Amino acid sequence: MHSTREQVPEEPDWSQRQIGYYRARAAEYDKAHNERTHMPRLVRALDELPVSGDVLEVACGTGQWTQLLVDRARSLTALDAAPEMLRIARDRMRGTTTRFIEADIFTWEPDRLYDTVFLAFWLSHVPPVEMEAFWNLMRWALRPGGCIVFLDDSTAKAEIEEFVAETRVPTVRRMLADGSQHLAVKVLYDAPSLTSQLNDLGWEAHVEPIDAYHFAGIARPRGSE
């Protein structure tokens, strides 16, 4: 794990910085996604997860996962804060009934309930200070009997990230093809610690490794019918 010393502004700047990074990255996002050698394993993991009914995808990006969800869902809503990402996602999903919402998930309020909320590599972008509020929002968005389904990076990914030191919110530096540098929240979990944290927040969670670098999980509100 690499680390540099830099003072980074605290909340709420982390959110706008993160959105700015993904807005700038939109044009090159698909190239990096398509070069990921682990994608077949992740898609197989998705096949084992209970994605069905009315589905909400949080942080849909350019729609790479959206296109895998649409046939599993009765209805599909895809949310992202970056208009440049959504423009590509809308083009990708043209001809489907996918509903797109441009909103910052940290200030968004759902206008309906969902059977499944899907998070692909988003949970690691939720800072610890927002974790409880975020999962309260997830509970609010779920229909009774619904679940949160997620895929994400494990702690092993720390060896390839450049973490910025002296920040209250765990932050990594990312460089784009044009040489510009950006900051994003990055919180890495292992399966046992994330399971424990979600249990403490009132969820029945089951998190399992997919490989050395990724995990998949399902979480349901404790006591849900």
Question: PLM ranges: what are they?
Answer:
Residues M1-V51:
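Conserved class I S-adenosyl-L-methionine
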Residues L49-P50, M93, L142:
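A generic alpha-to-beta junction signature in SAM-dependent methyltransferases
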Residues L56, T62-T107:
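Class I SAM-dependent methyltransferase SAM/SAH-binding core
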Residues F118:
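A conserved beta-strand element that flanks and buttresses the S-adenosyl-L-methionine
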Residues F121-W122:
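Short catalytic micro-motifs in class I SAM-dependent methyltransferases
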Residues E132-P144:
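A short glycine-rich, Lys/Arg-flanked "PGG" loop and its adjoining helix->strand segment in the class I
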Residues L151-L198:
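C-terminal alpha-helical "lid/dimerization" subdomain adjacent to the S-adenosyl-L-methionine
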Residues A184-R220:
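Conserved Class I S-adenosyl-L-methionine
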